[in-house]
Design a protein with these regions (language model features):
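Non-catalytic protein-protein interaction segments used by genome-maintenance enzymes to assemble
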Residues: 143, 150-198
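Metal-dependent nuclease catalytic cores that hydrolyze phosphodiester bonds in DNA/RNA
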Residues: 1-162, 272
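Hydrophobic/aromatic-lined pockets within catalytic cores
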Residues: 56-61, 154, 182-185, 209-213
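A residue-level signal for conserved active-site and pocket-lining positions in enzyme catalytic cores
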Residues: 49-53, 167, 251
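Metal-dependent nuclease catalytic regions and adjoining charged, substrate-binding loops involved
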Residues: 92-93, 97-103, 191-195, 206-286
């Protein structure tokens, strides 16, 4: 299933939909209920991340993933201004390709190859003492589910839910879920998990438990971060047991709040109409 098809489905609750609700009930209502707001359009950085996933997870030929702009379509300032140029770009993007200029193509390919090779070369020992080689033990393992969506019903809220992990294997009643993230600065990876990626761990862990019968404490979720530029440094991270438990609690709170908002048809934003007193001083220029 393509990413576009997966995200177009709003009949069940995905991790990204729940993230939108946590950010703003008004945004959730606009995108998924009233459908007056469009989803964020794909940026160049997002497209590069998608292509890196294709290279790592699906082994697609890299030369088929980029569309080099013909010189004849470029205007004098180097842009795509004509109707023909814009139609060509739209057609390439509809096929999932990233559009680049000829002088950019080599650099883009080098970065994708660098990130792919860095991720596939990762080997790590988990906190339980098990060595995991991403290429052999996960991505190329017999029975691995690569970007395969699954559905479940959340029994407490009654919501239909869905998830699509990058890669998942179930071995002897234990699940290993791997998610690949590209990042500009590898030193920010830990902050990214604490800030927003905790929701992904909780959502997928709940889904694996409900859809595949794997207890939440037997679902290992590994984030594999890879830097977007040379030397393509990597970090493999997992949440501590305490942080994972907290993430699952916060996930349940968010789902319960979404259920309450739908029941009451109340889409006012968090703290809307409330006077917020700021009590943090930002030091100025000396």
């Amino acid at each position: 299933m393509s990413h576009e098809t997966y995200h177009a489905n709003v009949r069940s609750v995905s991790r990204s939909m729940l993230a939108d609700f946590i950010e703003s009930p008004a945004i959730y209502h606009g995108r998924y209920v009233a459908k007056t707001l469009e989803r964020q359009s794909e940026t160049h950085a997002m497209a590069m991340g998608t292509l890196t996933h294709c290279a790592v997870l699906q082994g697609e030929r890299l030369d088929s993933m980029l569309a080099v702009i013909p010189d004849s379509l470029l205007s004098e300032d180097g842009g795509l201004r004509t109707k023909a140029a814009k139609e060509w770009k739209a057609a390439q993007q509809a096929e999932g390709k990233i559009v680049v200029k000829a002088h950019e193509a080599d650099n883009q390919l080098a970065d994708i190859i660098g990130m792919r090779d860095a991720v596939l070369g990762v080997s790590v020992v988990t906190d339980s003492g098990v060595r995991v080689r991403l290429r052999e033990d996960i991505f190329q393992r017999h029975g691995v589910a690569i970007e395969t969506p699954f559905d479940w019903i959340d029994t407490e809220s009654g919501f239909p839910m869905r998830a699509m992990p990058d890669a998942m294997v179930i071995i002897d009643g234990n699940a290993i879920v791997v998610d690949v993230k590209t990042i500009a600065d590898i030193n920010r990876a830990e902050f990214a998990i604490a800030d927003s990626y905790w929701l992904q761990v909780a959502h997928y862990t709940e889904g694996v438990a409900a859809a595949h019968g794997v207890p939440t404490d037997r679902c290992l979720f590994l984030f594999v971060f890879v830097e977007k530029s040379a030397p393509y440094r990597t970090r493999v991270m997992q949440m501590s047991a305490n942080m994972k438990a907290k993430a699952l609690e916060e996930w349940r709170v968010a789902v319960s709040q979404l259920h309450d908002r739908i029941t009451r048809d109340d889409w006012n934003d968090w703290r809307s109409g409330e006077l917020i007193v700021v009590d943090r001083f930002i030091k100025g220029i000396q």
